[in-house]
Amino acid sequence: MSYVNRHLIHQINQSARLIAKKANEQLEPFGLYSSQWSVLYCLRTIGPMTQKEIWSYLNVEAPTVTRTIKRLEENGWVQRRQGEDKREKLVVLTKEAEKKYEEINVKMLKFEEELLADFRDEDKEAFSHLFRMFLQQ
């Protein structure tokens, strides 16, 4: 077994932690963490979702999403609304979050650009392709 095969998951985890740490630094002026940004990004990109849809999409445990949404709600970023089915609640961005979203997104896109600046376009395409394959398993 090659070095890469023995250590790839560890390297991916270390990279994810480093990226999350640096993302948190970018988001700190907005009072957000990367996990919260993931939920906001998800809601803006996909639209109103149930908590179950969010945790399913983000591949995280239900209690984690519940805590994250609770904090976002307490800080005025999201609100829960009655869904078409009376038993379900939809999580939606607040008007204030909609206003701030673009500013945060621009900052995060710049962060991503800087983070990947030393990579060739072909490398970025390969990363994207491999991660999509991995997520489809």
From Swiss-Prot:
**Membrane spanning stretches:** none
Gene3D superfamilies with a match to the protein in the record: Winged helix-like DNA-binding domain superfamily/Winged helix DNA-binding domain
Q: Which InterPro entries match?
A: HTH_MarR-typ, WH-like_DNA-bd_sf, WH_DNA-bd_sf
Annotated protein name in UniProt? Uncharacterized HTH-type transcriptional regulator YwoH
**MF term (GO), any:** DNA binding
Q: Could you name the domain of life of the organism this protein comes from? A: Bacteria
Species in which this protein is naturally found: Bacillus subtilis (strain 168)
Instruction: Supply the alphabetized keyword list.
Output: DNA-binding, Transcription, Transcription regulation
Pfam families registered for this protein in UniProt:
MarR (PF01047)
Record carries keyword Transcription:
yes
> Known PROSITE patterns for this protein?
HTH_MARR_2
SMART domains, per this entry?
HTH_MARR (SM00347)
Q: HTH marR-type domain: from which residue to which, for each copy?
A: 5-136
Binding region for DNA: 51-74
